[in-house]
Regions:
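N-terminal beta1-alpha1 cap of cysteine-dependent amidohydrolase-like domains
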Residues: 1-57, 61-72, 209-213, 217-252
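Cysteine-nucleophile active-site neighborhood
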Residues: 47-129
Length: 252
């Protein structure tokens, strides 16, 4: 089956373009009933509060939660990671509704505002083992969240060093006791738990499609028909968008 991409706001076009490079059709999802057409789903980066309001307006949250509960693969990038988290802190007054399912606590905008966005080379040994290529990945962080805590069943795929003071300021938002401060700590920026994948950065804004390939293999592991659908999808795209304009730059 095709891969759904939640197309309420954010970098959904870039995800669809990355899937197309791998010969897989991406389907824009805006309504609950459209989820029945796909076997997996990507929730892209964007403005998480805006995305949540639009999802609530279209009554998508019950269908998204059911999609997760059915064990279908879901990948959240940046704002999508916030959606999948069981708990989010650092939110605006009133917070936002979450899909949940990923046993972690995410700090929204952990790395700061738009002007504090950055790129860095992340160590990704698990990704390299599965997909080949270098053991680093160019992480593009734009008003990015970070994962502060994970449950025992969550596999950490990448982390990033931060000054201990910044981390402890964020942990205080969890009302958790602070440990003795060191010079540097790490926050988690990529995780996997069963059918769920989460990245705090934007793989869709790079020319490296290994995270998309990794997610497609997760999809193939879930259903017997998924692996064959990926191989026969080819480069054909019958969606209404013949050419996809990029809302955000693709970093080479």
């Amino acid at each position: 089956m095709a891969v759904g991409v939640l197309a309420l706001q954010g970098s959904f076009n870039e995800h669809i373009a990355a899937l197309r490079k791998l010969g897989v059709k991406g389907v824009e999802i805006r309504k609950p009933e459209q989820l029945e057409q796909v076997g997996s789903l990507i929730i892209p980066g964007g403005e998480s509060t805006t995305m949540a309001k639009l999802a609530e307006y279209h009554n998508l949250f019950p269908a998204l939660r059911e999609f997760v509960k059915l064990g279908k693969p879901v990948w959240g990038t940046c704002a999508g990671l916030i959606f999948l988290a069981n708990k989010a802190v650092g939110q605006k007054t009133g917070g936002q509704e979450l899909v949940g399912g990923l046993d972690c606590t995410v700090h929204r905008n952990f790395f700061g505002s738009q002007i504090q966005s950055f790129e860095t080379q992340l160590s990704v040994p698990e990704l390299a083992a599965k997909e080949g290529g270098p053991e680093t990945f160019r992480g593009v962080f734009i008003r990015a969240p970070a994962i502060l805590e994970v449950g025992p069943k969550v596999e950490v795929l990448a982390d990033y060093p931060v000054p201990s003071g910044k981390l402890f300021d964020s942990i205080s938002a969890l009302e958790a006791p602070q440990e003795n401060a060191g010079s540097e700590k790490k926050v988690i920026v990529a995780v996997k738990q069963g059918n769920l994948l989460g990245t705090a950065f934007h793989p869709e804004l790079t020319a490296d499609t290994r995270w998309h390939s990794y997610f497609l293999k997760m999809t193939s592991e879930v259903g017997e028909e998924a692996s064959s659908s990926i191989s026969v999808a080819g480069g054909e795209d019958t969606s209404s968008n013949e050419q996809l304009g990029n809302d955000l730059p693709i970093y080479q």
